[in-house]
Amino acid sequence: MDLPPDSRTALRDWLTEQLADLLGEPLADVRALADDDDLLGCGLDSIRLMYLQERLRARGSTLDFAQLAQRPCLGAWLDLLACADRLSAPATVALPTVQDRDQPFELSSVQQAYWLGRGAGEVLGNVSCHAFLEFRTRDVDPQRLAAAAECVRQRHPMLRARFFDGRQQILPTPPLSCFDLQDWRTLQVDEAERDWQALRDWRAHECLAVERGQVFLLGLVRMPGGEDRLWLSLDLLAADVESLRLLLAELGVAYLAPERLAEPPALHFADYLARRAAQRAEAAARARDYWLERLPRLPDAPALPLACAPESIRQPRTRRLAFQLSAGESRRLERLAAQHGVTLSSVFGCAFALVLARWSESAEFLLNVPLFDRHADDPRIGEVIADFTTLLLLECRMQAGVSFAEAVKSFQRNLHGAIDHAAFPALEVLREARRQGQPRSAPVVFASNLGEEGFVPAAFRDAFGDLHDMLSQTPQVWLDHQLYRVGDGILLAWDSVVGLFPEGLPETMFEAYVGLLQRLCDSTWEQPADLPLPWAQQARRALLNGQPACATARTLHRDFFLRAAEAPDADALLYRDQRVTRGELAERALRIAGGLREAGVRPGDAVEVSLPRGPQQVAAVFGVLAAGACYVPLDIDQPPARRRLIEEAAGVCLAITEEDDPQALPPRLDVQRLLRGPALAAPVPLAPQASAYVIYTSGSTGVPKGVEVSHAAAINTIDALLDLLRVDAADRLLAVSALDFDLSVFDLFGGLGAGASLVLPAQEQARDAAAWAEAIQRHAVSLWNSAPALLEMALSLPASQADYRSLRAVLLSGDWVALDLPGRLRPRCAEGCRLHVLGGATEAGIWSNLQSVDTVPPHWRSIPYGRPLPGQAYRVVDAHGRDVPDLVVGELWIGGASLARGYRNDPELSARRFVHDAQGRWYRTGDRGRYWDDGTLEFLGRVDQQVKVRGQRIELGEVEAALCAQAGVESACAAVLGGGVASLGAVLVPRLAPRAEGSMELPAAQPFAGLAEAEAVLTREILGALLEAPLELDDGLRRRWLDWLADSAASALPPLDEALRRLGWQAAGLTAMGNALRGLLAGEQAPAALLLDPWLAPQAVAARLPDGREALARLLEALPTPAAGERLRVAVLDTRAGLWLDQGMASLLRPGLELTLFERSRVLLDAAATRLPERIVVQALDDGLLPAEHLGRYDRVISFAALHAYAASREGLALAAALLRPQGRLLLVDLLCESPLALLGAALLDDRPLRLAELPSLLADLAAAGLAPRCLWRSERIALVEALAPGLGLDAAALQAGLEQRLPQAMRPERLWCLPSLPLNGNGKVDRRRLAESMTRALGECRDEPSAEEPLEAHEQALAECWEAVLKRPVRRREASFFSLGGDSLLATRLLAGIRERFGVRLGMADFYRQPTLAGLARHLQAQTVEIEETQLEEGVL
């Protein structure tokens, strides 16, 4: 009927008719409602409101759901409609119907998700969407019950549906029964109970045979004592929750009085799906635009604590937590909801979201909300059993400190906004997000089933009683919240995946949820809805953070001067061969203090100390403190601009250096001049609260920030460690940390203050592990204190060269400690040596927490922070400064007696980072961490190390831990790479194999008579001409050449022509070399161009000399010839321009030999690629980064006269070992002494002598690198060594497989590289910024290079066509991943159907997930095809 827009009465009558129909209330009662009555209090919920909106839209209304939900009362709606267009009768639209109802039809989007989720390859898959219900009753008639089950199955087509290949089909009669009977009445009670528990566990988690039409199964177990246990197993592919209620109701009627069952409705589910799509096409298009616009801003799943990666759970099982609100509690909540204008479902949903936010790292997340959407024109739609569910995404952005009334209204507004756009369902939104490279997930479900009636219909209760228990499970769902009316109350149920969450976490969260709801029953909702920390957790943290300080307040330097007075002759410092006693050091310090006082230094002033490591540096620090000032340590290599920034920011009044410059700003005083001056009688008295030092750390803005620490703060930390370690005069501490790194504070004032001696490495030994090892052994060092990377360097030395058995305690801090490090350290140290891992911040007095490590438990992902030190406290807080529960990640705040005063002369930054609240003063570390449930603190990396890549939150520390867990990986560093689309990359350091046993015997050196003399003749000839030419030579270069000429002057040398004959050279070669050198020296080309010159490049020169030619020939002979059909993969390290390869090219191009050249310079590599045959592969090592796909790939690795190019030979050997497969061999030609001719060119590049090893040392280095060496041949100047690799067990496939077990796909690095060692910054920490820049450059080069893919094989091309059909895009690369090209699970299902149709091979989803690349799937498909052909052939023969 038409509704005139000017007739408010007619509009009201029509609205009340619709409401009466939707609410199931008498029309007279609805018409009696006032215009301002809140309809939510009358039973109107979101679903019914959505149905009303659709009815309005069918009559031409443009009102959306949100408008109707904003003021749900008749008067407001009439006002809105009065302003809207004329309403009319629904337009007559030809709705589609299914012609042949016996044919398969498509699944709905929700059914697709459930169907795909059953696959074993899905995360938390291998399980059906399933409900199991249990009832306990008596005197059931099995025959009548079986007949009732079959009756209901025949009434409803979807109870006879089979599901296959992503489609569904109605069967006339499924082959499997829908009833199961077990009679256990004769069993003992305990035996029957055991059997029941086993049966219940099986049936509650079973996957029904839906492919054969078994979608539900009704069971009866007859127990001893007359009890009957009735159970129902239902696959929710065929029925939603409302359908479950209908199924129960009809089972009750069919059992008690089947004649009362009405004729079933004629509506077919296929018709419904087709009609709904047609009716909602316009709304779906609008909703799609809405969600795509919101996509970049959508949050992700709740970041709840997990016990394991979801994909690691192969066979999910669920368990239920349940609580029933009483009738009184339920009524009070309903009354309060009506008073605040919200639905009861919104109340429960908001409370659920608040609990999730409390236990989530982020208070912004997505919820998955099912809508049971049965709207259709057929009035009997409510009598149809099928799955009418629509899933929608609900954005939750929970705010702290707001009242519950405000929170629930905000929640409801968001819910209504989502419902308004439900025509584009959640699954489509998530698929679109994945296609756009912004994957999201919504594995937490909020389902509300609060109908007017109870969950179990009266008809069923009359026959069998009420629900005893229930359990549900859904693929890909972590936690499923459900609400039901049961009896007079409301049942709250959480179904969660067993083993996914830490033990006890769901129970703790559920307890908080129930407690919140019970408090809401008795409150006005106007107070903040914050959830308190569980009481037991509060008590435990109070105990941990309440340890009293160990320190007696005093200055840092007091104890040392007291000890110097008590025992002046005791050793204080051991440096090189010097021994500085306490008395001598104290006197030097007081002399420096006297000089500073004379220069005008007064208490509180800042004095810079910028000296090389050594006794003078230590004396200067004590001297500054003795003068009453605070010291500002600056490295001697500090860049001038940064030095000026720090000096100005700190207000440095003068600097102690190795030069005198009184006019400089600040003035510089020579430490030697200060030491010659008079000494103070005693240190200037100072209060412990005075500033002791200012250490500058890097600032995020690029401006260094100076942490100002008082004496009292630092001494509190130091005393805690001294108390732990019991340091005394017998101890010797190796001081490897730089003065501007705060670990040195403990070395100086903890070590010397307790009476220990400091062993000081010299400035040039700052990164020399061999020098440290020598010092440890010589001085019997007992204490080690450093960043982990420095200890790793020390442990990399072979035990035969580094004896650490004097160490009794090792302190590590400042960076991640590898989990295997304690096990590698233990056998190298004294028995009983303890490893103490510390953490904290410079802003909190060196350290604030301690974890002593003996053994590493298997559940540790990293070495935890442990417990707070005495006098210090830790909090883990959220973004609002609230303490978060155990296991929840938050920001670490440090409090207590060791806090710094703040940032020097920067009150604004100090106020931001040092905060005050009701619990005291706290330093906000910017670190992420959490408390375990035993009170242990776990450090999880910097806040700025948690990154987002393609919308996915990623913790770099977790990626690194997963890499380090791989066999053969020593350490790793992950980073987000720039350069266009952000991606994740990582560098790993391979672990060297254990020391290898090889042969140290040396063959007799092959003589080359007259070679040295002949080479000297040519060298003198060239040098003489160059030195006489009018060329501007560098003084160092001229001196080096003249020195050589002088050294060789006394030698008796042959004539030039004889020298050329001995070398096998032509005179033209000599001329070419001289001309090339002359051009370089004249500036016609850059010195680096000599590496491209065939007569000057050092490797090329070595290969032209007789002994080099012989070594190269023997190396090539050592390469085996591949058998027919086999391949020999050969890698050449540090190829340079490959000029030396020319002499062996024919041998290297033999059939079956695959040659790959590796080079760190792209210029040289490009030159090699241009010159050499196309079949030779070239690979750049940008910044030394080796792409991980080359790990463990090669049968032979060649290094020709290149090992000396590495800073340490072990780095080159580690790289070679990483390239080799197990039992592969390194063929190494190395120079044993300099060649004069090679010196001509090399001196232009580097005026330092070449780092050449003696042959026994080289063999020892090979053995230490895990390579078993054998010298094959040698001359006096060059040697050929073969080394066998046991293999690291490390290759690209193994790495990928290991990462797949530990990390979800979004967290796996796109690219992996290998380095012999990670670069360190000045403080001995991994230089992450440098690595990220290197990886970004390397990635950019990789992306810029044209694809080297070979053409697709015929079977790959055929498969690619199948891919293109479903992906709607070209597929050209064999290593392309289906998912990276935009594929998803639904498209994969269609692809597998297409493969079956084209190739006749049935592949499972698990096969596809194992082989997601074109090449991998093609190989698998080819193997399956061959197997089928062989089977068919065998059958034909038989």
Curated annotation (Swiss-Prot):
The modification O-(pantetheine 4'-phosphoryl)serine is found at S46, S1385. Keywords: Antibiotic biosynthesis, Ligase, Phosphopantetheine, Phosphoprotein, Repeat. Residues 6-85, 1350-1425 form the Carrier domain. SMART domains: PKS_PP. Pathway: Siderophore biosynthesis; Antifungal biosynthesis. Involved in the biosynthesis of the siderophore pyochelin. Accepts salicylate activated by PchD at the first peptidyl carrier domain (ArCP), and activates and fixes one molecule of cysteine at the second peptidyl carrier domain (PCP1) via a thioester linkage to the phosphopanthetheine moiety. Then catalyzes the condensation reaction between the salicylate bound to the first site and the cysteine bound to the second site, and the cyclization of the cysteine to form the salicyl-thiazolinyl-S-PCP1 intermediate at the second site. The lineage of its organism: Bacteria, Pseudomonadati, Pseudomonadota, Gammaproteobacteria, Pseudomonadales. Gene3D superfamilies: 3.30.300.30, ACP-like (1.10.1200.10), Chloramphenicol acetyltransferase-like domain (3.30.559.10), N-terminal domain of ligase-like (3.40.50.12780), Nonribosomal peptide synthetase, condensation domain (3.30.559.30), Vaccinia Virus protein VP39 (3.40.50.150). Its EC number is 6.2.1.69. InterPro entries: AA_adenyl_dom, ACP-like_sf, AMP-bd_C_sf, AMP-binding_CS, AMP-dep_synth/lig_dom, ANL_N_sf, CAT-like_dom_sf, Condensatn. Modular protein that contains an aryl carrier protein (ArCP) domain which bears a phosphopantetheinyl arm to attach the activated salicylic acid, a condensation/cyclization domain involved in the cyclization of the cysteine, an adenylation domain which activates the cysteine residue into an aminoacyl-AMP ester and a peptidyl carrier protein (PCP1) domain which bears a phosphopantetheinyl arm to attach the activated cysteine. One of its GO terms (biological process) is antibiotic biosynthetic process. PROSITE patterns: AMP_BINDING, CARRIER, PHOSPHOPANTETHEINE. GO terms for cellular component: cytoplasm. PANTHER family: FATTY ACID SYNTHASE, NONRIBOSOMAL PEPTIDE SYNTHETASE. This is Pyochelin synthetase PchE. Its cofactor is pantetheine 4'-phosphate. GO terms for molecular function: ligase activity; phosphopantetheine binding. It catalyses: holo-[peptidyl-carrier protein] + L-cysteine + ATP = L-cysteinyl-[peptidyl-carrier protein] + AMP + diphosphate. Residues 136-442 are annotated as: Condensation/cyclization. The keyword Ligase applies. Belongs to the NRP synthetase family. Residues 563-950 are annotated as: Adenylation. It is an enzyme of class 6 (ligase).
